[in-house]
Amino acid sequence: MLGVCHCTNCKRRTGSAFGISTYFAKDAVVRQEGDTKVYAFHHAAQNHDQERHFCPNCGTTLYWFVSSLPDKIGIAGGCFDGEGLPEPTYAVSDAKRVSWLSLPSRWQVWAE
C-alpha cells in the first residue's frame, strides 16, 4: 500500500503539504540497526492509536504502527532512496488537501 495523507497530523510530521506513507506486513520488514525514539498518541480525526518511531539524532520519522492496521508497519516515503518508490495509488484526508495541489484521476481518493 502506497499513498498520500493530507491530514494535519501528517502535514506537521513531514513539514510539507502531505505525507507519503507505505505499508507492509510487519513480518516483511527487518529493522537494520540503531535505536529510535517513540511518540505515541491517539489520532482523534481518524480514530486510531499511533506509535511513531523516529531517529533520535536527526528527527526523521522512520516508521509507525497504527491500531486500525494491526498487521502492518508504515514506513515514511522519504526513507526510500532514489527512484525506488513507485507512484502512490490513493489519497486520504483529501478534504484537508491544499487547494493548489491536484491529484491524478486514476488514484482512489477518500475525503477523510
Predicted features and spans:
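A short Gly-Trp-Pro
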Residues: 1-112
